Amino acid sequence: MYDTIILGNGIAGMSAAIYAKRANLNFKIIGEDEFSVGQIENAVLVENYPGIKGITGYNLGNSIREQIEEMGIIIEEKKVESIEKIEANTNQISEFFKIKYTDGTEHYSKTVIYALGSKHRELSEICDVKDNVTYHHCAICDGPLYKGKDVAIIGGGNTAFTEALYLSKIASTVRIITDKIIADSTLVEKVCDTKNISVIDKAKVMSLYKELNSICIDYEYKNILCKTTVDGLFSAIGSKPQSYYCPSEVEKSYSGYILGNECGETNISGFYVAGDIRRKMLRQAITAAADGANCANSVVEYLKQS
């Protein structure tokens, strides 16, 4: 029986692991991909993490992974299938969690720190995408494929604008197509000052299809159906929470984010939530790290009382 099982090896999960190790808890950290460091690895540039002037998301996440490895913490690669809370009614423990994995194995733990984060939304959720259309989620990973070519990014948030700036140094032209700009004003200013980036705002993407070797984007702008053609396409329309593995009793928002307070406590005793999966106003690397630390501390306090 473990003290806690940490599900997720992004910044929130790894932060929880650091604090769990320092508290001498008996725990495991589980990740679907042991070599991944979560959504942060797709960030082209992180400039708002205290103490670090500028770093790629992958390098930031990897430095944290190196830190936990130096502490002797090993990420175990497994995919969660289900989590069940079980009433024990023994002298030693009154309740515990059974975590079942797709490989048929199970873990039993007094608590769970759920930090599985979110995954990219697909463009098929907002428009018609033909089967032969290929697009990307990561500019830093796939941007070099389009050196000197024309690319487009669908999305209006910080990710879209940051990746546009990165792609502007590789591609010939970059077009941002969005129904609403929600990126920070500093990013918007940088994009507007970059000559080979254009922004098509208040546009509704209707369909994506191929003609010869090009990707065609049909969109509605001011009630007029327009068309643009590019060599490469990137998606930055947000993410959806991976909350479908948690116990059915756990309260969630309408969008599927788990309801938890600043200590990570949910409506289920012993079940804690950290990182992007938690309903909150700000989802950043720094808030994910804080969530993980708070959850590990909450586990320590919970175990003292149980």
What are these regions (language model features)?
Residues 3-28, 163-164:
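N-terminal Rossmann-like FAD-binding beta1-loop-alpha1 element of flavoenzymes
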